[in-house]
């Protein structure tokens, strides 16, 4: 007699499937966030016992995670594995059901979890520091999953604005090339155009896509200050070198870095140099926020120039990079053209005295019994501008070389003196004439002299009629004579009758 028994016939092989919640890989198999694997086994007669399920997880650099318990509905049965620590992982899934049917093995190839951003260090230059010597930044990059994925950028700030100067600077590489890489920049060339404020930005990414950014702002200041004037009256005075009225002197000093010291010295002809007192003799203002060039403005009070004299203003400063700056002397290594652009020499003369003009040979209201007359003109001034000589005869401008000549002494033209000679001719028929001489000096003062109402004539009749008093007296006398003659003639006739 047989006992009734139940049994199951199962000829269907189980099916294994593995899925992940994070499939955003970089460089094939690098992930910068956690991954959770869901293992699904489709089997009607499922058993989670270890003799049926085998899921070995391999981990490098960390501890292998465990499979978290099974749950399911119907024939589908699920378990999860969480990969939440940095490391390299791989695993396989094998399952054999109760009937001995084996599922096709599911193999998950190795992948990396890397949630750690690269370590970046910038040396060789420091934030908000100024350099007048070697400038050679060094970037050190450390990461377990190194990738040569970097962006280095030098943004230069100069007086005219910003520019991308990245391509101007070269580097050499070092490090082990696996977990550490070093970029060593070569010393910036010591040329004027490299002076400026630099924002050096470094951005590096590893194989998982983690990125780190770092930046430093530093200054290259090997050539010191540029001095200039944007004040129109000051610029005009510097270019001319002379003035007849004292005025404020305004000068700008432009430097890559802030100034730590400054002074203004005034030299005056006939006296010693004097260091001026800030806020009494001059004012000083400076603006700098660390991310732009420093602009300092010196305003020297006009009261310092009240006397007639020759003046020289010297501005000296020391900047944060320890350069000593002088408005009259730029760095000696610069070209002449570069020096001229960076210097602003301030030397000028205050002259309030008008030129002295004298005319000899003729006088006001004089009558000359000559057909021609030689006249001498002498102009005197310490700062005479001989090009401003104007000679007019009866409001007609005379021409040098044609109407008058400039006379030099045997040693050449005397400094501060001009002598001219003019030969006046009696061509106006005894009419009164006026000679006027005007001349200016380099400071803008004007001197003048005139001789008015003179007469030049060799003709006795022209001279007679040119003298109204003589003409009136003559005709008055003649009238009296005629009247007397008429009177006597009339009287004689009356007696005869």
Summary of predicted features, one role per range:
Residues 479-497:
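C-terminal membrane-anchoring or membrane-association module
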Residues 71-79, 174-187, 287-299, 409-423:
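Aromatic sugar-binding surface patches on proteins
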Residues 15-28, 121-131, 228-240, 355-367, ...:
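Short, solvent-exposed loop/edge segments of extracellular or virion-exposed proteins
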Residues 41-52, 62, 141-152, 253-261, ...:
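Extracellular acidic loop/turn motifs
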Residues 1, 96-102, 205-210, 318-337, ...:
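Short, solvent-exposed loop/turn segments at the edges of extracellular beta-sandwich modules
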